[in-house]
A protein has these predicted regions:
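Conserved alpha-helical substructure of the radical SAM core
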Residues: 1-121
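Conserved radical SAM core fold
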Residues: 33, 77-79, 103-108, 123-140, ...
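Residue-level signal for pocket-adjacent positions within structured domains
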Residues: 45, 101, 131-132, 161
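Short, conserved loop/turn and helix-capping segments at secondary-structure boundaries
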Residues: 49, 139-143
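A general structural detector for well-ordered alpha-helical segments in enzyme core domains, enriched
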Residues: 54-58, 86, 110, 142-152, ...
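Structural beta-sheet core signal
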Residues: 99, 124, 162-164
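Short, basic, helix/turn surface patches
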Residues: 121-132, 150-159
Length: 174
């Protein structure tokens, strides 16, 4: 496994020869388990997940185009029933993977799958203190679940960027 300095060199070399996008955001599913008022994602009962085969064809195309990084997101990435197979498939294609999540479905077992396939970083949405976060996401208890997911990631060696959307509800609490 390369050190941070070596990894920086790998990235610089890749950028010198790049003929395609360096990074691609790939929406794995439009489905989400939360109901944030500002978000375009839909609740679980309204939409369907794309097939695993469809996602694999997209990953194949990105690999052929020599895309370096795929950022996996949704909706909520972890609502996708085959999220672990997607991670494994993309890893086997040599893709560098990150993810975006609301954190509520992340467990230490899921983090173990992520790290087994080289996922070292991701992003989790935290929209302020507990009361504001729960109000924004439309689900009481979502803050506590997101924090447990964040802690599972950090405990398992996955670095996390915290994403915050500023709204009227949290603007004075950030």
């Amino acid at each position: 496994e390369p050190s941070s300095l070596e990894f920086g060199g790998i990235v610089k070399n890749k950028l010198r020869t790049i003929r395609s996008p360096f990074s691609v955001n790939l929406e794995i599913t439009p489905v989400c388990n939360l109901r944030c008022g500002f978000c375009f994602a839909e609740s679980e009962c309204q939409l369907h997940h794309p097939s695993f085969g469809h996602i694999c064809r997209i990953i194949d195309e990105l690999a052929r185009a020599e895309v370096f990084e795929i950022r996996l997101f949704g909706g909520e990435f972890f609502t996708y029933p085959h999220w672990d197979r997607v991670i494994e498939y993309a890893d086997n294609k040599g893709m560098f993977l990150t993810f975006v999540s609301n954190g509520t479905l992340i467990t230490s077992e899921k983090v173990a799958v992520l790290t087994r396939h080289g996922v070292k970083s991701g992003a989790i949405s935290i929209h302020g203190p507990e009361d504001a976060h729960d109000a924004i996401t439309g689900m009481k208890g979502s803050y506590q679940k997101a924090m447990r997911g964040l802690e599972a990631c950090l405990g398992g060696g996955v670095y996390i960027t915290v994403l915050t959307t500023i709204t009227q509800t949290n603007k004075n609490k950030i």
